[in-house]
UniProtKB/Swiss-Prot annotation:
Part of the 50S ribosomal subunit. Keywords: Chloroplast, Plastid, Ribonucleoprotein, Ribosomal protein, RNA-binding, rRNA-binding. One of its GO terms (cellular component) is chloroplast. NCBIfam families: rplV_bact. PANTHER family: CHLOROPLAST 50S RIBOSOMAL PROTEIN L22-RELATED, LARGE RIBOSOMAL SUBUNIT PROTEIN UL22M. It comes from Nandina domestica. The gene is rpl22. One of its GO terms (molecular function) is structural constituent of ribosome. This protein binds specifically to 23S rRNA. The keyword Chloroplast applies. This is Large ribosomal subunit protein uL22c. Belongs to the universal ribosomal protein uL22 family. It comes from the Eukaryota.
């Protein structure tokens, strides 16, 4: 029996159009947790903040409830469904009123721990297109390798080789 490798967070009745939320969700689907937080922090859309809170909540569920490492989390599923429409009446001239429709949406974020999943394979994007990679490379390892290469080209020493880099914003 395989261990559970997924954890989720669900946001219901978020006051925004499902179309606007999907625009942001499509940008973060399949990416690692660290990269998602940076992308959502820098995107200029109003939908980013509720999605940021959901991703952060799902990661907190993963670490507290399941004991997963945040550096090995990716978004395996992210979906946006239409919710109910909140209807209000706006008073107008001569005793009339116009209806106002406020759409809502339901957002589901599912995070997967890659280090615990034996059957996980990752697709990497290269200049020529997508290539299939059978072995998962930890994001932290890629980051450390990049820093090591950049600093060695400049003939500098890098002392913090064992430091774990996780960007966490509350």
């Amino acid at each position: 029996m395989e261990p559970e490798v997924e954890v989720y967070a669900l946001g219901q009745h978020i006051c925004m159009s499902a179309h606007k939320a999907r625009r942001v969700i499509d940008q973060i689907r399949g990416r690692p947790y660290d990269e998602i937080l940076m992308i959502l922090e820098l995107m200029p859309y109003r939908a980013c903040y509720p999605i940021f809170k959901l991703v952060y909540s799902a990661a907190a569920n993963a670490t507290n409830n399941k004991g997963f490492n945040k550096t090995a989390l990716i978004i395996s599923q992210a979906e946006v469904n239409e919710g109910t429409v909140v209807k209000k009446l706006k008073p107008r001239a001569r005793g009339r009123s116009y209806p106002i429709k406020r759409p809502t949406c339901h957002i589901t974020i599912v995070l997967q721990d890659i280090s615990k999943d034996k059957n996980f394979y990752i697709w990497l994007r290269k200049k020529g297109g997508w290539i299939y990679k059978e072995k998962y490379i930890d994001i932290r390892e890629k980051y450390e390798y990049f820093l090591h290469e950049a600093l060695n080209r400049g003939r500098m020493e890098w002392a913090n080789s064992g430091y774990e880099v996780v960007w966490d914003k509350k």
